[in-house]
Amino acid sequence: HTISRRQRQMCIRDRSGIAKLYRQSGLFTWQLRGGSRDSLRPGLQDPWKGNATRGSDIMAYRSSPASSDEAHASFAWLRDLRAEGSVEARSRARDLITDWIGANSSWKLPDWRPDLMGERLAIIAMNYGWYGDSADETFQSRLAHSVEMQLRCLAMDWRRMRSVDQQIGALRGIALAEAALGGEDSRIEALQDMLFPKIRNVTHDDGGHVSRMPDRHIRLMRQLVEFRMATSLASVDGSALSDTIKRMGAVARMWRHGDGRIAHFNGGGGISAEIAEETLLRAGVHGKTIQQAPYSGFLRMGSGRTVVIMDAGDMAHGDDIIAGSGTLGFEMSVGPTQLVVNSGQMMKDPTLRRVMCSTAAHSTLGLDNQNSSSPRDGRLASISGVEVGEAPGGLLAVGAHDGFERSHGIIHHRKLYL
């Protein structure tokens, strides 16, 4: 007989509830234990800066990592204490880590959520040389045993994570923890072999993220830079991974305005100029900025201090993608001043975000308050005739889309001359 949707959802909830009860049991904790490694290796160095002001606030008890469950569980505050840099900050870091281990000796949410475990393991491993190498043996041993438990749990969970981006984040946490624990080179190599198909699933051949979301693209780049550190410590060949990072870096670089910030296409605008700069630096991107990412669908023109960046790609769509209906929209800056920008869609309110995703919220042609694409109606603008290059006295970018053809019988052709 057939099972109704409601019955199916109840079955899923029942299985989820049983699994949660098992994970909270002593049997599951016993399953995670049994590690034989007593300390981490200090060879990794976190490539990302913390915030010294936030670190000082933690030291002065003006703020507490525990004030936010997710921020506390990710251990992002460890970078801030490292940036503060004092001996007292190192001691405070050890105390906070010891407290967390004591409160999380067995599985519980949200701290043991896979995405948070991946982030936490990466930060623990990459900063160990600062806070852990000079600690006493009791701290080192207790931390190593906790890391091994988390490592086993994440190894069970990462394949069930919803998005490929999240799975990559988990794999980088596993790789860094394995490298820091002195795992065999073959383990890191096997993890890298699992990583490459995931990367191919979420990137175009030109290096751009398939979501066409600049902020998401840069977050993925940072995770791959971290994974590469694990291959280096384990003496595993990471040259292919480096090539991937450089391709992604070339696309990220073409999104930058004169002030160093990233263009506001498709949910962009949340990455600071400082984070963009340090990411590109670690990516090792050199040479001339590219003018076109043909598969990702972006063009760039630069003349003197003026930069024009154009969205010339088909709209991406998916449950976890923020896609603006800004086909053939552009942004323009002169030096550090942004003159023409899109609104971005970083707001949490779904209604406001939907408004900011509309064609009217972008620097492109709109007709009768209608979006150029509407995934809900099965109507997606198709791009054609995209080119960028030299023209008499300057540069020219051209493209066309048919988003209004069905409704208005109109093809939108755009030419931008700089």
Segments from the language model and where they lie:
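Aromatic-lined, polymer-binding surfaces characteristic
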Residues: 65-245
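Extended, charge-enriched "interface" segments that sit outside catalytic cores
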Residues: 13-72, 110
